[in-house]
């Protein structure tokens, strides 16, 4: 009888032991405030990060966040270096062939920023100017 009770209690204890939440590795690129940026304590912050944190929490996952360079973020995802992105990402047909996307949670348009007094009427007006852009973004001209 004692042995049966002991085995039953051991089985119950094993069933009641908390299971550690699975940790998902999430990549971001903290160069796009207010969506992804480093706060004054150099901690990743922003809407995309808060959104991913809450979704994973509600799904029962822990999150390991990595701030990575944008020009390698998709290669790292494809290589399995991380499980998902918490980064402002344009959904393109090419990217849809390689990755799954959530429903978009915000929209944005591309714009050219010029000093006051300079005017452009078309992309052709930019030919004689020096134009800067982040590597690997869809806004590259």
What name fits each language-model region?
Residues 30, 106-114:
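Periplasmic-binding protein-like
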Residues 114-131:
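Flexible hinge/capping segments at coil-to-helix
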Residues 132-141:
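Secondary-structure junction motif
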Residues 93-104:
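Ligand-binding "clamshell"
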Residues 1-9:
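Bacterial N-terminal signal peptides that target proteins for export
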């Amino acid at each position: 009888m004692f042995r049966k009770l002991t085995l039953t209690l051991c089985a119950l204890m094993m069933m009641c032991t908390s299971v550690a939440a699975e940790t998902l590795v999430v990549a971001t690129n903290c160069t796009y405030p207010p969506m992804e940026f480093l706060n004054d304590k150099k901690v990743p912050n922003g809407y995309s990060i808060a959104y991913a944190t809450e979704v994973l929490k509600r799904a029962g996952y822990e999150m390991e966040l990595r701030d990575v360079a944008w020009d390698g973020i998709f290669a790292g995802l494809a290589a399995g270096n991380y499980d998902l992105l918490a980064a402002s990402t344009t959904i393109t047909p090419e990217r849809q062939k390689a990755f799954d996307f959530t429903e978009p949670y915000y929209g944005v348009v591309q714009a050219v920023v010029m000093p006051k007094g300079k005017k452009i009427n078309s992309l052709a007006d930019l030919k004689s100017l020096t134009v800067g852009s982040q590597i690997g973004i869809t806004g590259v001209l």
